[in-house]
Curated annotation (Swiss-Prot):
Keyword terms, alphabetized: Cell membrane, Disulfide bond, G-protein coupled receptor, Glycoprotein, Membrane, Olfaction, Receptor, Sensory transduction, Transducer, Transmembrane, Transmembrane helix
Full protein name: Olfactory receptor 2F2
UniProt key word Plastid: no
A GO term from the CC aspect: plasma membrane
Organism field: Homo sapiens (Human)
Gene name linked to the record: OR2F2
Highest classification ranks of the organism: Eukaryota, Metazoa, Chordata, Craniata, Vertebrata
Parts of the chain on the Cytoplasmic side: 50-57, 121-139, 220-236, 293-317
InterPro entries the record matches: GPCR_Rhodpsn, GPCR_Rhodpsn_7TM, Olfact_rcpt
Job of this protein: Odorant receptor.
């Protein structure tokens, strides 16, 4: 019975970013505004793509998936974080912690695979423009999107099951903003080298493999761009990929820094800041990046705003 009591913990205490009340209130206000802007921005991107027939292309189909992933990821972390800023007892039940870990891992994995798929899409658009529609047909796009969602979910299910089978003893204080993988593994009172090895393998399979595919796609894209004779043609081809390349650099960079070397990786504070960036900043940046650096999206925004202003003018008269 002693072992069973040590193995299962009913709830965890999240230590969060700060214990100072004024700091928590300030962070609550900042994160609430950021979260609402994230939900609004990504939902508007999805709505815009849905309403504008010019955006019914493979690139924007995958961007729709990416926006849904971003909103879901932020929602898996931020509401609980906001609630804990205002709560005196910052507890999270065992089942909720496991669910949060599963969804955050799954959605993160899905995003990595989606970014690799989007890189392939950009490669085809630049390198094989004439056959783009034939190659990136609806059936292939659907299969690639499903592969992204399934692979991320399966990896997360395995990692979550392995992690929550570890004996946690009496230690229930998670020094993090959420039930993050490395933070939960650190609670175990047994040797976790096998779990860290599993994290490493998982990171290589679901993080480095898509990353290598992204690199390969961009090597071929750059090779094609350099062969374009006109300066205007090279500029147009580069702008086709600029938004995606920016998101790839931000997304993969922070996660590789966190997970590829668990022993010699970032400090606990750095892990918290990286998680804040990934859960709060990145989902907000994605729609901004794709809107500001994409002429088609900006054109669709202007068209939608013109329709809206015309409608309000008619209603006003």
């Amino acid at each position: 019975m002693e072992i069973d009591n040590q193995t299962w913990v009913r709830e965890f205490i999240l230590l969060g970013l700060s214990s100072d009340w004024c700091t928590q209130i300030s962070l609550f206000s900042l994160f609430l505004v950021t979260y609402l802007m994230t939900v609004l921005g990504n939902c508007l991107i999805v709505l815009l793509i849905r309403l504008d027939s010019r955006l019914h292309t493979p690139m924007y189909f995958f961007l729709t998936n990416l926006s849904l992933v971003d909103v879901s990821y932020a929602t898996s972390v931020v509401p609980q974080l906001l609630a804990h800023f205002l709560a005196e007892h910052k507890a999270i039940p065992f089942q909720s912690c496991a669910a949060q870990l599963f969804f955050s891992l799954a959605l993160g994995g899905i995003e990595f695979v989606l970014l690799a798929v989007m890189a392939y899409d950009r490669h085809v658009a630049v390198s094989d423009r004439l056959r783009y529609s034939a190659i990136m047909h609806g059936g292939l796009c659907a299969r690639l999107a499903i592969t992204s969602w399934v692979s991320g979910s399966i990896n997360s299910l395995v990692q979550t099951a392995i992690t929550f089978q570890l004996p946690m003893c009496t230690n229930k204080f998670i020094d993090h903003i959420s039930c993050e993988l490395l933070a939960v593994v650190r609670l175990a009172c047994v040797d976790t080298s096998s779990n860290e090895a599993a994290i490493m393998v998982s990171s290589i399979v679901l993080l480095m493999t898509p990353f290598c595919l992204v690199l390969l796609s961009y090597i071929r894209i750059i090779s094609t761009i350099l062969k374009i004779q006109s300066r205007e043609g090279r500029k147009k081809a580069f702008h086709t990929c600029a938004s995606h390349l920016t998101v790839v650099a931000l997304c993969y960079g922070t996660t590789i820094f966190t997970y590829i070397q668990p022993h010699s990786g970032p400090s606990v504070l750095q892990e918290k800041l990286i998680s804040v960036f990934y859960a709060i900043v990145m989902p907000l940046l994605n729609p901004v990046i794709y809107s500001l650096r994409n002429k088609e999206v900006k054109g669709a925004w202007h068209k939608l705003l013109e329709k809206f202003s015309g409608l309000t003018s008619k209603l006003g008269t």
